[in-house]
Amino acid sequence: MRIHYLLFSFLLVLLSPLSAFSKKVYNAVSCMTNGGICWLKCSGTFREIGSCGTRQLKCCKKK
């Protein structure tokens, strides 16, 4: 039964980096790394995933 605890902890360690993708982007380099573009306003085919360092610039990514 102890192997179940080991496998469960191993699974948690493997899946924990996946939660990092749900965090907002706050600078232009992170925006481009995540496949986004810095624009003033996201158009209809794009969704906002964060900001590019200022309040005016939004990091937009295709839906």
From Swiss-Prot:
Single GO cellular component term: extracellular space
Disulphide bonds in the chain: 31-59, 38-52, 42-60
Propeptide: 21-22
Entry's Gene Ontology molecular function annotations: CCR6 chemokine receptor binding; chemoattractant activity
Name this polypeptide is given: Beta-defensin 3
Record's keyword terms, sorted: Antibiotic, Antimicrobial, Cleavage on pair of basic residues, Defensin, Disulfide bond, Secreted, Signal
Pfam families: Defensin_beta
Organism name: Rattus norvegicus
Chief location bin: secreted
Family, per entry: Belongs to the beta-defensin family.
Record-linked InterPro entries: Defensin_beta-like (IPR001855)
Function recorded in the entry: Has bactericidal activity.
Entry's Gene Ontology BP terms: cell chemotaxis; defense response to bacterium
Compartments reported by the entry: Secreted
Signal peptide: 1-20
